[in-house]
Amino acid sequence: MQVRLNERQQQVLWATVRHYIATAEPVGSKALAEEYNLKVSAATIRNIMGALEQGGLLYQPHTSAGRVPSDSGYRIYVDYLMTPANDLSRRVEQLLSDRLNPTSISLEAVLRGAAQILATLSGYITLITLPQTLTATIRWLQLVRVETSRVMLIVVTDNYETRSALMELGDTADTEESRIERELEVLTNFLNHQLRGRSLTELANLDWQQLDREFQRHGDTLRTLLQDLLQRSQPVGSNQILISGLSEVLQQPEFSQLQQVQTILHLLEDEQDQLWPLICEWSVATDAAPITLPSQQRVRILIGSENPLEPMRMCTLVSSTYQRGSVPIGSVGVLGPTRMPYDKVIPLVEATADYLSDTLGQPA
């Protein structure tokens, strides 16, 4: 703890943050004395709040008003005084499992559904990045004959995405049907042996020497096909962020000013390239201090002035990664006012990330 606080100061800071989160009103010593069992008088609480203000953890928005937490006060609360409501995690994961079925809907539909559920539960803006396509691993490949001389290569990745491309077999008029089918079977087995469990970036790195000589006449065609498939797997705007919960956050008093709302909307709609590195903490190092929850899931919290983007300095961003094995492939985040119930939002973000890791991130 960078700021040394005695036990009473910790209790008063904890109560002040909790009360302000609940009421959105500046907090006075009388309210804390009446509503929290601090076992000291209102006068003593007032003195302690004064000391916390001198330490930069509280401030007075107006001379006659009570006090509210500063960004530093929230940071001390989050890192040292808060107890996460971990009972939420199991309920959230069960809710996501009940409402989303990744085997019957698309990957993007799963992510959009998760974003909507998280926004509803948190009451804030939810941000979920699409998986980086080229980090996906190949689950299986298959060559399927679709016309007399045309074959489709189908590639299915571990995050339920499908890629396909057509190839010409050339003149097959004098080739027996059974031989063509056998060649396709051998080539399919070769591709699966070479590429299953490897990333899409490795599509062009096959050891063609292992392909039997009689089938190597298809090698150049397959190589070109795979390179084309790799090129098309690099989506335009691959740093896309799915956003939900705009209507929820507009109900917060911090966003009552039209200019504040317009600033946030501009960031979310037009400046995603700036926002993406902040939510994807696994790709960009920052000075923000992570906290470790009981499951050892790292959750990053950027509070107010810790945010490098000016439009977000009235906000907090809570984010975590979802993974394939130990490799991050995307991120989940909640964006709201600094006055948010961190003890609830952090487990919600963590549980959503865990669900996506379990559902979408299993190795091939």
UniProtKB/Swiss-Prot annotation:
The protein's GO terms of the molecular function aspect are:
DNA binding
Q: What does this protein do?
A: Negative regulator of class I heat shock genes (grpE-dnaK-dnaJ and groELS operons). Prevents heat-shock induction of these operons.
Does the record carry Repressor as a key word? yes
Alphabetical list of InterPro entries matching this protein: GAF-like_dom_sf, HrcA, HrcA_C, WH-like_DNA-bd_sf, WH_DNA-bd_sf, WHTH_transcript_rep_HrcA_IDD
Q: What is this protein called?
A: Heat-inducible transcription repressor HrcA
Query: Which UniProt key words apply to this protein?
Result: Repressor, Stress response, Transcription, Transcription regulation
- Extract the NCBIfam families matched here: hrcA
